[in-house]
Amino acid sequence: MELNIIEIKDFDAKELDIYARLSEGQLLNRAEPEKGIFIAESPKVIERALDAGYEPISCLIEKKHIDGEGKAVLEKCDRIYQNTKRYSDAEKQENLVLKNSKENTVSEEKYALKNIKYKETDMSDFPVYTAEFDILTKLTGFKLTRGILCAMHRRPLPALEEICKDAKRIAVLENVMNPTNVGAIFRSAAALNMDAVILTNGSSNPLYRRAARVSMGTVFQIPWTFIDISGNGETYIGRLHRLGFKTAAMALDDNSVSIDNESVMSEEKLAIILGTEGDGLLKSTISESDYTIKIPMSHGVDSLNVAAASAVVFWELGNK
């Protein structure tokens, strides 16, 4: 089937709003996750999102990449898009048959699905918008990494209890607002065998374009969810304790112990809590945690960037 290549001629086309005029916050639409959209950037990130089950809506690609680096991922997007559409059509047909059937038997359901007819065409209806590099840069406001973007449907996030059910080692990001740091932490967490990442609601969303790109798509490979720290009722530290986790706050404190502390590393279920750039963790988080830990440093250096610090502590955990 031939790809549905659409050359961009009108910057104001409604279909391009998701790439040109909507903020990432508007795309994500946290209040209604079933309607939310995110933008994946680069072939590697898009492919990992597709492999994780996210459904594509459309692609925006630089012309020279259509038959080059972007070809395989465009074809994969198209296949998934068509399969999703057919599955949706089958569900609609099934519901219609069940509604109109007097007996609603299992055999009727199977017959209805088996006999759905699809219109075969030579042209895909998965939209692939394209233009030269300068036009795409002007449209989006930034230079596309590896020349391709893909708009995708987001999914409702799992509950904290589901994420933590079988986890032994998790990372908690408290108000980490920089998407580059969030992406780098996810990449380290995936590479160094952490089981999940939990984010407080003041943190950058891992599905932001830059966060997902910096993570190299690992935001689609490691389980994650948001946790509320509004202070209404039980604290998030309390929830983690209730789920069987000991908590270790990364902070410079008179009571801090080294990350290789035997008691810390021997905990069966451990949550490493990392704080926002600059201010670090909330005092209440530190006081409620079971441990306060630090990375031993030299030459008068007292701290590392949160993404760098996370890689060190994840590696240390992996060696125990």
Residue ranges and their predicted role:
Residues 1-67:
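Boundary-proximal intrinsically disordered activation/regulatory segments immediately upstream
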Residues 6, 79-82, 100, 123, ...:
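RNA substrate-binding interface of SAM-dependent RNA methyltransferases
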Residues 44-46, 65-66, 134-135, 203-204, ...:
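Alpha-helix capping/helix-boundary segments
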Residues 71-124:
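Intrinsically disordered, low-complexity terminal tails and inter-domain linkers enriched
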Residues 125-132:
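A glycine-rich helix N-cap at a beta->alpha junction
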Residues 147-150, 188-192, 206-219, 283-320:
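Structured adenosyl-cofactor binding patch, chiefly the S-adenosyl-L-methionine
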Residues 248-301:
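Active-site/ligand-binding-proximal alpha/beta "capping" segment
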